[in-house]
Amino acid sequence: MVSAMPDATLCPRCGAESHYLLTPRDRTEGPPASIRLCASRVCGVGFTEPAPDDLAAAPAASPSGEVEHRLASRIVSAGLSHLMRRLAPGDTVVDVGAGSGLRARVLAERGFRVIAIEPDPAEEMRAHAMMSSLPAGARVEVVRAGVDELPAVMDGRTAQAAVMWHVLEHLHHLDAGLGTVAGVLADGGLLGVAVPNRRSAEARAFGPRWHGWEPSRHRWHFDEDSLRLVLGASRFSVADIGTRGGWGYPSGVAYSIAPGLDPQVHPGTGLLGRALAAAMIPVAATARAVGHGGQLVTIARRAAR
């Protein structure tokens, strides 16, 4: 028996009945009294029930010193490596949910033209600050906008790639958001996606305490099959999917062990938190290498119109 809790909740995505997964422990609020995670019996997508009040991503901790910046940049670069290798210098990349701007900066430093959108005003300002020391010639736009405003931002332009790095799990309207991103990509354009892997060894090991659940902000919870289905429904064909990318999800291991060092929840712990995450790279990389890492990284290609 999976759980004694009732299975009456309907999936908000496909409308099918669901089954109970677990009751998570929120990293900021402790064990919630009524929140539970369920998964559709048809589309397989997991979801937080009831829906979180605040689906915005937690503010990312900006690197505060040279050592921390180098470490954070290396982690981001490793995660994006599979996508960047498939692009040509000068290609346009849309960073959806740019946060503090570190990912957009890494892409710009590699010679791509970057259009970074971020709906949170404070994060948008931090992203602008992140770009202030870019070398001459770097091409990057930072715009305060959500996914639904992306067509207006692009104003008829198309991109060769888009990045949704830990964004899908926050979207109010999952399929509509993916469809909007697909609409600004050129035929054959690439989409790079990263989401927490709910079937990972880390999720099983930490159970309700796993950092990747984040029930106060994550509406959706994916495994490989459900992510494939969702992308396919928005006319993306998956070119590569799995946990074998970059260094895995070391922060998921680190902050599940020591939530007090999570810089998103406890500002001022950035260097210590990232140092712990770096120390967890061998653990995360081992899980990644055998296909059970905490982060699913996907490269998908947009179908021709």
Please name every model-derived segment.
Residues 175-190:
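A short glycine-rich, Lys/Arg-flanked "PGG" loop and its adjoining helix->strand segment in the class I
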Residues 193-220, 225-230:
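Short, glycine-/aromatic-enriched active-site segment of Class I SAM-dependent methyltransferases
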Residues 27-29, 239-266:
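Conserved catalytic loop of SAM-dependent methyltransferase domains
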Residues 172-176, 203:
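Short N-terminal helix/helix-N-cap motif within the alpha/beta-hydrolase-1
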